[in-house]
Protein backbone atom coordinates (compact mmCIF):
# COMPACT_ATOMS: atom_id res chain seq x y z
CA UNK A 1 0.00 0.00 0.00
CA UNK A 2 1.35 3.44 -0.94
CA UNK A 3 1.69 6.23 1.61
CA UNK A 4 -1.15 8.12 -0.05
CA UNK A 5 -3.41 5.07 0.17
CA UNK A 6 -2.45 4.48 3.80
CA UNK A 7 -3.16 8.09 4.76
CA UNK A 8 -6.53 7.85 3.03
CA UNK A 9 -7.35 4.58 4.82
CA UNK A 10 -6.45 5.96 8.23
CA UNK A 11 -8.56 9.05 7.67
CA UNK A 12 -11.67 6.87 7.58
CA UNK A 13 -11.01 5.13 10.90
CA UNK A 14 -13.00 6.22 13.95
CA UNK A 15 -9.98 5.58 16.17
CA UNK A 16 -7.88 7.98 14.07
CA UNK A 17 -10.36 10.86 14.16
CA UNK A 18 -9.82 14.08 16.08
CA UNK A 19 -11.75 14.32 19.32
CA UNK A 20 -13.66 17.61 19.59
CA UNK A 21 -13.72 17.32 23.39
CA UNK A 22 -9.92 17.51 23.70
CA UNK A 23 -8.92 20.06 21.08
CA UNK A 24 -7.70 22.41 23.82
CA UNK A 25 -6.04 19.77 25.99
CA UNK A 26 -2.60 21.33 25.53
CA UNK A 27 -3.84 24.50 27.25
CA UNK A 28 -5.12 22.80 30.40
CA UNK A 29 -3.64 22.35 33.86
CA UNK A 30 -2.61 18.91 35.10
CA UNK A 31 -5.86 18.60 37.05
CA UNK A 32 -7.91 19.60 34.02
CA UNK A 33 -6.02 17.22 31.72
CA UNK A 34 -6.62 14.18 33.92
CA UNK A 35 -10.28 15.17 34.35
CA UNK A 36 -10.66 15.34 30.58
CA UNK A 37 -8.95 11.96 30.15
CA UNK A 38 -11.20 10.50 32.82
CA UNK A 39 -14.28 11.80 31.01
CA UNK A 40 -13.12 9.98 27.90
CA UNK A 41 -12.40 6.77 29.80
CA UNK A 42 -15.97 6.69 31.10
CA UNK A 43 -17.14 5.96 27.56
CA UNK A 44 -15.26 2.66 27.41
CA UNK A 45 -17.49 0.40 29.58
CA UNK A 46 -20.55 1.49 27.61
CA UNK A 47 -18.84 0.58 24.33
CA UNK A 48 -17.98 -2.85 25.76
CA UNK A 49 -21.54 -3.29 27.02
CA UNK A 50 -22.79 -2.85 23.46
CA UNK A 51 -20.85 -5.94 22.29
CA UNK A 52 -21.57 -8.29 25.21
CA UNK A 53 -23.56 -10.71 22.99
CA UNK A 54 -20.52 -11.17 20.74
CA UNK A 55 -18.23 -11.58 23.75
CA UNK A 56 -20.54 -14.27 25.18
CA UNK A 57 -20.58 -16.05 21.82
CA UNK A 58 -16.78 -16.04 21.82
CA UNK A 59 -16.70 -17.40 25.38
CA UNK A 60 -18.87 -20.34 24.34
CA UNK A 61 -16.50 -21.15 21.46
CA UNK A 62 -13.42 -20.84 23.65
CA UNK A 63 -14.93 -23.01 26.39
CA UNK A 64 -15.87 -25.69 23.87
CA UNK A 65 -12.35 -25.65 22.45
CA UNK A 66 -10.80 -25.99 25.91
CA UNK A 67 -12.98 -29.02 26.63
CA UNK A 68 -11.64 -30.66 23.46
CA UNK A 69 -8.02 -29.98 24.34
CA UNK A 70 -7.72 -26.84 22.23
CA UNK A 71 -5.92 -23.63 23.13
CA UNK A 72 -6.73 -19.93 23.09
CA UNK A 73 -4.25 -17.88 21.10
CA UNK A 74 -4.10 -14.10 21.29
CA UNK A 75 -2.25 -12.38 18.44
CA UNK A 76 -1.59 -8.71 17.83
CA UNK A 77 1.00 -5.99 17.30
CA UNK A 78 2.13 -3.18 19.59
CA UNK A 79 -0.24 -2.40 22.44
CA UNK A 80 -2.75 -4.96 21.16
CA UNK A 81 -0.15 -7.72 21.23
CA UNK A 82 1.13 -6.72 24.65
CA UNK A 83 -2.37 -6.83 26.11
CA UNK A 84 -2.82 -10.35 24.75
CA UNK A 85 0.47 -11.52 26.26
CA UNK A 86 -0.48 -9.89 29.57
CA UNK A 87 -3.85 -11.64 29.80
CA UNK A 88 -2.38 -14.99 28.74
CA UNK A 89 0.41 -14.78 31.33
CA UNK A 90 -2.08 -14.22 34.16
CA UNK A 91 -4.03 -17.43 33.52
CA UNK A 92 -1.64 -20.02 35.05
CA UNK A 93 -1.38 -18.44 38.52
CA UNK A 94 -5.02 -17.33 38.59
CA UNK A 95 -6.66 -20.51 37.35
CA UNK A 96 -4.00 -23.18 37.86
CA UNK A 97 -3.78 -24.03 34.15
CA UNK A 98 -0.83 -24.85 31.90
CA UNK A 99 1.03 -21.92 30.36
CA UNK A 100 0.25 -23.53 27.00
CA UNK A 101 -3.53 -23.25 27.41
CA UNK A 102 -3.65 -19.51 26.68
CA UNK A 103 -0.81 -18.09 24.59
CA UNK A 104 -0.08 -14.52 23.57
CA UNK A 105 1.79 -13.78 20.34
CA UNK A 106 3.10 -10.34 19.43
CA UNK A 107 4.52 -9.15 16.11
CA UNK A 108 8.29 -9.04 16.46
CA UNK A 109 8.47 -11.63 19.22
CA UNK A 110 9.46 -11.24 22.87
CA UNK A 111 11.61 -8.16 22.25
CA UNK A 112 8.50 -6.33 21.03
CA UNK A 113 7.07 -6.51 24.56
CA UNK A 114 9.63 -3.88 25.61
CA UNK A 115 10.81 -2.19 22.41
CA UNK A 116 8.86 -1.40 19.26
CA UNK A 117 9.90 -3.68 16.39
CA UNK A 118 9.57 -1.48 13.33
CA UNK A 119 7.80 -3.05 10.38
CA UNK A 120 6.87 -6.33 12.09
CA UNK A 121 3.15 -5.55 12.06
CA UNK A 122 3.22 -4.82 8.32
CA UNK A 123 4.21 -8.39 7.45
CA UNK A 124 1.09 -10.44 6.68
CA UNK A 125 3.04 -13.69 6.30
CA UNK A 126 4.60 -13.28 9.75
CA UNK A 127 1.25 -13.83 11.45
CA UNK A 128 0.79 -17.21 9.80
CA UNK A 129 4.44 -18.06 10.49
CA UNK A 130 4.06 -17.36 14.20
CA UNK A 131 1.00 -19.63 14.35
CA UNK A 132 2.92 -22.39 12.59
CA UNK A 133 5.71 -22.07 15.16
CA UNK A 134 3.30 -23.07 17.94
CA UNK A 135 1.66 -25.84 15.87
CA UNK A 136 -1.66 -24.00 15.66
CA UNK A 137 -4.44 -26.38 14.61
CA UNK A 138 -8.15 -26.52 13.92
CA UNK A 139 -8.75 -27.38 17.60
CA UNK A 140 -7.46 -23.98 18.70
CA UNK A 141 -9.16 -20.58 18.84
CA UNK A 142 -7.46 -17.47 17.47
CA UNK A 143 -8.29 -13.99 18.74
CA UNK A 144 -6.79 -11.41 16.40
CA UNK A 145 -6.40 -8.08 18.21
CA UNK A 146 -5.98 -4.77 16.37
CA UNK A 147 -7.46 -1.44 17.41
CA UNK A 148 -7.45 -0.27 13.79
CA UNK A 149 -8.80 -3.58 12.55
CA UNK A 150 -6.45 -3.50 9.57
CA UNK A 151 -3.03 -4.70 10.82
CA UNK A 152 -1.50 -7.00 8.14
CA UNK A 153 0.14 -9.25 10.77
CA UNK A 154 -3.28 -9.98 12.28
CA UNK A 155 -5.04 -10.29 8.92
CA UNK A 156 -2.54 -12.89 7.74
CA UNK A 157 -2.94 -14.93 10.93
CA UNK A 158 -6.75 -14.87 10.79
CA UNK A 159 -6.74 -15.98 7.16
CA UNK A 160 -4.36 -18.84 7.99
CA UNK A 161 -6.52 -19.94 10.93
CA UNK A 162 -9.64 -19.83 8.76
CA UNK A 163 -7.94 -22.03 6.16
CA UNK A 164 -7.29 -24.61 8.89
CA UNK A 165 -10.92 -24.56 10.00
CA UNK A 166 -10.19 -23.07 13.42
CA UNK A 167 -12.49 -20.68 15.27
CA UNK A 168 -11.47 -17.09 14.59
CA UNK A 169 -12.40 -14.00 16.61
CA UNK A 170 -11.55 -10.39 15.78
CA UNK A 171 -11.19 -7.69 18.43
CA UNK A 172 -11.13 -4.19 16.95
CA UNK A 173 -12.26 -0.72 17.98
CA UNK A 174 -13.45 0.33 14.53
CA UNK A 175 -16.76 -0.73 12.97
CA UNK A 176 -16.78 -2.96 9.89
CA UNK A 177 -13.01 -3.45 9.96
CA UNK A 178 -11.09 -5.83 7.67
CA UNK A 179 -10.39 -8.27 10.51
CA UNK A 180 -14.08 -8.21 11.50
CA UNK A 181 -14.97 -9.28 7.98
CA UNK A 182 -12.43 -12.13 8.03
CA UNK A 183 -13.19 -13.58 11.47
CA UNK A 184 -16.19 -15.73 12.34
CA UNK A 185 -16.96 -13.62 15.42
CA UNK A 186 -16.36 -9.86 15.44
CA UNK A 187 -16.07 -7.99 18.74
CA UNK A 188 -15.93 -4.28 17.95
CA UNK A 189 -16.33 -1.92 20.93
CA UNK A 190 -16.32 1.49 19.26
CA UNK A 191 -14.91 3.92 21.81
CA UNK A 192 -14.64 6.89 19.47
CA UNK A 193 -11.67 9.17 18.77
CA UNK A 194 -8.87 9.13 21.32
CA UNK A 195 -8.03 12.04 23.62
CA UNK A 196 -4.71 12.20 21.78
CA UNK A 197 -5.45 11.62 18.11
CA UNK A 198 -4.54 8.09 17.06
CA UNK A 199 -3.10 7.05 20.44
CA UNK A 200 -5.01 3.79 20.63
CA UNK A 201 -3.18 2.72 23.80
CA UNK A 202 -5.77 4.91 25.54
CA UNK A 203 -9.51 4.14 25.20
CA UNK A 204 -9.02 1.42 22.59
CA UNK A 205 -6.42 -0.34 24.74
CA UNK A 206 -8.65 -0.09 27.80
CA UNK A 207 -11.57 -1.58 25.88
CA UNK A 208 -9.40 -4.41 24.59
CA UNK A 209 -8.17 -5.17 28.12
CA UNK A 210 -11.74 -5.34 29.42
CA UNK A 211 -12.77 -7.71 26.63
CA UNK A 212 -9.74 -9.98 27.07
CA UNK A 213 -10.42 -10.13 30.82
CA UNK A 214 -13.96 -11.26 30.06
CA UNK A 215 -12.91 -13.89 27.51
CA UNK A 216 -10.55 -15.75 29.85
CA UNK A 217 -12.40 -15.16 33.11
CA UNK A 218 -15.78 -16.25 31.77
CA UNK A 219 -14.29 -19.25 29.97
CA UNK A 220 -12.46 -20.41 33.08
CA UNK A 221 -15.61 -20.02 35.18
CA UNK A 222 -17.43 -22.17 32.62
CA UNK A 223 -14.72 -24.79 33.13
CA UNK A 224 -15.30 -24.91 36.89
CA UNK A 225 -12.30 -22.81 37.85
CA UNK A 226 -14.33 -20.88 40.42
CA UNK A 227 -16.59 -21.76 43.33
CA UNK A 228 -19.05 -18.97 44.02
CA UNK A 229 -16.76 -16.03 43.17
CA UNK A 230 -13.62 -17.57 44.67
CA UNK A 231 -10.50 -18.47 42.66
CA UNK A 232 -10.38 -22.02 43.96
CA UNK A 233 -7.83 -23.17 41.37
CA UNK A 234 -5.32 -20.46 42.28
CA UNK A 235 -1.75 -21.73 42.07
CA UNK A 236 -0.06 -20.83 45.35
CA UNK A 237 3.47 -20.13 44.13
CA UNK A 238 4.45 -17.14 46.28
CA UNK A 239 3.69 -15.76 49.74
CA UNK A 240 0.83 -13.57 48.54
CA UNK A 241 -0.84 -16.41 46.66
CA UNK A 242 -0.33 -18.82 49.55
CA UNK A 243 -2.04 -16.32 51.84
CA UNK A 244 -4.80 -15.89 49.28
CA UNK A 245 -5.33 -19.66 49.15
CA UNK A 246 -5.69 -19.70 52.94
CA UNK A 247 -8.25 -16.90 52.78
CA UNK A 248 -10.16 -18.67 49.99
CA UNK A 249 -10.47 -21.84 52.09
CA UNK A 250 -11.56 -19.79 55.10
CA UNK A 251 -14.15 -17.86 53.08
CA UNK A 252 -15.58 -20.98 51.45
CA UNK A 253 -15.82 -23.03 54.64
CA UNK A 254 -16.05 -20.48 57.49
CA UNK A 255 -13.15 -22.27 59.17
CA UNK A 256 -10.33 -20.62 61.11
CA UNK A 257 -6.89 -19.85 59.69
CA UNK A 258 -5.15 -22.72 61.47
CA UNK A 259 -7.63 -25.24 60.08
CA UNK A 260 -7.39 -23.75 56.59
CA UNK A 261 -3.61 -24.03 56.68
CA UNK A 262 -3.84 -27.65 57.84
CA UNK A 263 -6.31 -28.47 55.08
CA UNK A 264 -4.05 -26.90 52.46
CA UNK A 265 -1.08 -28.86 53.75
CA UNK A 266 -3.07 -32.09 53.59
CA UNK A 267 -4.33 -31.27 50.07
CA UNK A 268 -0.88 -30.29 48.76
CA UNK A 269 -1.84 -26.60 48.53
CA UNK A 270 -4.93 -27.36 46.43
CA UNK A 271 -7.62 -24.97 47.68
CA UNK A 272 -10.38 -26.70 45.76
CA UNK A 273 -9.60 -30.07 47.34
CA UNK A 274 -9.16 -28.49 50.77
CA UNK A 275 -12.64 -26.99 50.57
CA UNK A 276 -14.19 -30.24 49.37
CA UNK A 277 -12.49 -32.21 52.14
CA UNK A 278 -13.73 -29.83 54.83
CA UNK A 279 -17.32 -29.55 53.59
CA UNK A 280 -17.83 -33.27 52.90
CA UNK A 281 -15.51 -35.01 55.36
CA UNK A 282 -13.70 -36.83 52.54
CA UNK A 283 -10.02 -37.62 52.80
CA UNK A 284 -7.51 -36.48 50.17
CA UNK A 285 -7.84 -39.55 47.94
CA UNK A 286 -11.64 -39.55 48.08
CA UNK A 287 -11.85 -35.83 47.34
CA UNK A 288 -9.43 -36.16 44.43
CA UNK A 289 -11.50 -38.95 42.90
CA UNK A 290 -14.80 -37.13 43.42
CA UNK A 291 -13.46 -33.92 41.89
CA UNK A 292 -12.22 -35.85 38.87
CA UNK A 293 -15.65 -37.45 38.44
CA UNK A 294 -17.26 -34.00 38.47
CA UNK A 295 -14.88 -32.66 35.79
CA UNK A 296 -13.29 -30.30 38.28
CA UNK A 297 -16.52 -28.53 39.29
CA UNK A 298 -16.43 -28.11 43.07
CA UNK A 299 -20.12 -27.28 43.44
CA UNK A 300 -21.08 -30.33 41.36
CA UNK A 301 -18.81 -32.57 43.44
CA UNK A 302 -20.52 -31.45 46.65
CA UNK A 303 -24.00 -31.86 45.18
CA UNK A 304 -23.19 -35.37 43.98
CA UNK A 305 -21.81 -36.24 47.42
CA UNK A 306 -25.07 -35.14 49.07
CA UNK A 307 -27.25 -37.28 46.77
Curated annotation (Swiss-Prot):
The active site is at residues 90, 121. Specifically catalyzes the cleavage of the D-lactyl ether substituent of MurNAc 6-phosphate, producing GlcNAc 6-phosphate and D-lactate. Together with AnmK, is also required for the utilization of anhydro-N-acetylmuramic acid (anhMurNAc) either imported from the medium or derived from its own cell wall murein, and thus plays a role in cell wall recycling. Keywords: Carbohydrate metabolism, Lyase. CDD domains: SIS_Etherase. The lineage of its organism: Bacteria, Pseudomonadati, Pseudomonadota, Gammaproteobacteria, Vibrionales. Its EC number is 4.2.1.126. Belongs to the GCKR-like family. MurNAc-6-P etherase subfamily. It is an enzyme of class 4 (lyase). Residues 62-225 form the SIS domain. It catalyses: N-acetyl-D-muramate 6-phosphate + H2O = N-acetyl-D-glucosamine 6-phosphate + (R)-lactate. It comes from Vibrio cholerae serotype O1 (strain ATCC 39315 / El Tor Inaba N16961). GO terms for molecular function: carbohydrate derivative binding; carbon-oxygen lyase activity; ether hydrolase activity. It holds the Pfam family GKRP_SIS_N. Homodimer. Pathway: Amino-sugar metabolism; 1,6-anhydro-N-acetylmuramate degradation; Amino-sugar metabolism; N-acetylmuramate degradation; Cell wall biogenesis; peptidoglycan recycling. A lyase-type mechanism (elimination/hydration) is suggested for the cleavage of the lactyl ether bond of MurNAc 6-phosphate, with the formation of an alpha,beta-unsaturated aldehyde intermediate with (E)-stereochemistry, followed by the syn addition of water to give product. InterPro entries: Etherase_MurQ (IPR005488), Glucokinase_regulatory_CS (IPR005486), MURQ/GCKR (IPR040190), SIS_dom (IPR001347), SIS_dom_sf (IPR046348). This is N-acetylmuramic acid 6-phosphate etherase 2. GO terms for biological process: 1,6-anhydro-N-acetyl-beta-muramic acid catabolic process; amino sugar catabolic process; N-acetylmuramic acid catabolic process; peptidoglycan turnover.
